[in-house]
């Protein structure tokens, strides 16, 4: 079982490197290829577009294959997409490479979660999914700084060549360590959409989107916030980014550790509440260096503490369409990144100081918590109504 979790964690590490590694090489990429930095920044959006487009397509048309074969196909797409990006010299080919790299992202998380739900004891699934997600958090802590170093010392192409080669190793681990099992719950194409008739998955999608949007409304502007509000120097940003990366790792670990004692719903709702409080503290107390570091750490820890319980809630409420539901969660996550960055930017467009980005951030996180509370209320009502419906008439 540990080898399966390790294999999936290696996969999410590679995805994390591909998704976020671009942020540390934009200047070198723009200079080398002869495009503007804003145009190079489009490569972030193309990856997100690949996630949004690829996840449902792969989820819908993969029902005839085993979960292991789907994983192998997804990792192969990672190799191809990152290799294309590495070898490209035109804007068009760079964009295509990023699109292909993003296609497998959402489906990989979904298939991985389904695999773990089938081989792990019910009470341990959330912890196992947290183990899978840990690869993404470690990528933020260690992988991305390594990629930035390679770009600065050699070339940005070395960063993405490393990602492509690493994913070949991931393919080998999937081939040897992941059991060849099928998702017998999958029905025909129409049946996979049946779960969307219930409000439950939509509330989880909303919680996922608003939760990520809340953190990203602030985190998208973390550098100017820390420099102009908290008073840190630019050289301190490397330490700060490693600190928040450590928060992501520890938040995910803590979520998995307590999953045996608390339900996924309780973990997610309480985490969103803590994030709301942390964001409000970042608004009011951002001028105090130590305080801003503490609550920045808490916000980023909370972001990844949400990942595993929300993934489990989606699987529980997507019967017959588990892969589509999990992929939809990744779409909601990426949509939240865009919504959050836009909402935070609105405060700056109005001419307000950088600490004001924490206000829409807190509001979005409160919306995430509210979505989860509404979900809990709906499930309680559903449970209360079931015995009544079961009684014979007359």
Swiss-Prot record:
Spans within the Cytoplasmic topological domain: 1-4, 64-69, 117-128, 179-198, 256-261, 317-322, 375-394
Q: Does this entry carry the keyword Protein transport? A: no
> Which UniProt keyword terms apply here?
Cell inner membrane, Cell membrane, Membrane, Transmembrane, Transmembrane helix, Transport
TM annotation in the entry: 5-27, 42-63, 70-89, 94-116, 129-151, 156-178, 199-221, 236-255, 262-284, 294-316, 323-342, 352-374
Which of the residues are on side Periplasmic? 28-41, 90-93, 152-155, 222-235, 285-293, 343-351
Instruction: Write out the annotated subcellular location.
Output: Cell inner membrane
What PANTHER family does this protein's entry cite?
A: PURINE EFFLUX PUMP PBUE (PTHR43124), TRANSPORTER ARAJ-RELATED (PTHR43124:SF6)
The similarity annotation says: Belongs to the major facilitator superfamily.
Descriptive protein name? Putative transporter AraJ
């Amino acid at each position: 079982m540990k080898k399966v979790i390790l294999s999936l964690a290696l996969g999410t590490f590679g995805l994390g490197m591909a998704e976020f590694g671009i942020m540390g090489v934009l200047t070198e990429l723009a200079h080398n290829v002869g495009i503007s930095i804003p145009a190079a920044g489009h490569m972030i959006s193309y990856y997100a577009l690949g996630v949004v487009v690829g996840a449902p397509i792969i989820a819908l048309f993969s029902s005839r294959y085993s979960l292991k074969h789907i994983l192998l196909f997804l990792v192969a797409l990672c190799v191809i997409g990152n290799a294309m990006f590495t070898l490209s010299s035109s804007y068009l080919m760079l964009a295509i490479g990023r699109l292909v790299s993003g296609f497998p992202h959402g489906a990989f998380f979904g298939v991985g979660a389904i695999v773990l739900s089938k081989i792990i004891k019910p009470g341990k699934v959330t912890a196992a999914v947290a183990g899978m997600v840990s690869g993404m958090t470690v990528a933020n802590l260690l992988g991305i700084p390594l990629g930035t170093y390679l770009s600065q010392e050699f070339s940005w192409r070395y960063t993405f060549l490393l990602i492509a080669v690493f994913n070949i190793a991931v393919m080998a681990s999937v081939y040897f360590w992941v059991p060849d099992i099928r998702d017998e719950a999958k029905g025909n194409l129409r049946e996979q959409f049946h779960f969307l008739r219930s409000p439950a998955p939509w509330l989880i999608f909303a919680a996922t989107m608003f939760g990520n949007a809340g953190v990203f409304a602030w985190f998208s502007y973390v550098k100017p916030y820390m420099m102009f509000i908290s008073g840190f120097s630019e050289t301190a940003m490397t330490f700060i980014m490693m600190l928040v990366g450590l928060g992501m790792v520890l938040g995910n670990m803590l979520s998995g550790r307590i999953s045996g004692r608390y339900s996924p719903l309780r973990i997610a709702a309480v985490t969103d509440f803590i994030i709301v409080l942390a964001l409000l503290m970042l608004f009011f107390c951002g001028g105090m260096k130590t305080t801003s570091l503490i609550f920045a750490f808490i916000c980023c820890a909370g972001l990844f503490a949400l990942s595993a319980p929300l993934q489990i809630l989606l699987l529980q409420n997507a019967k017959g369409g588990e892969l589509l539901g999990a992929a939809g969660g990744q779409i909601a996550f990426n949509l939240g990144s865009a919504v959050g960055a836009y909402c935070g930017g609105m405060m700056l467009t109005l001419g307000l100081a950088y600490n004001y980005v924490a206000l829409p951030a807190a509001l979005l996180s409160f919306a995430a918590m509210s979505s989860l509370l509404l979900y809990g209320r709906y499930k309680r009502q559903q449970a209360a109504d079931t015995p009544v419906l079961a009684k014979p008439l007359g």
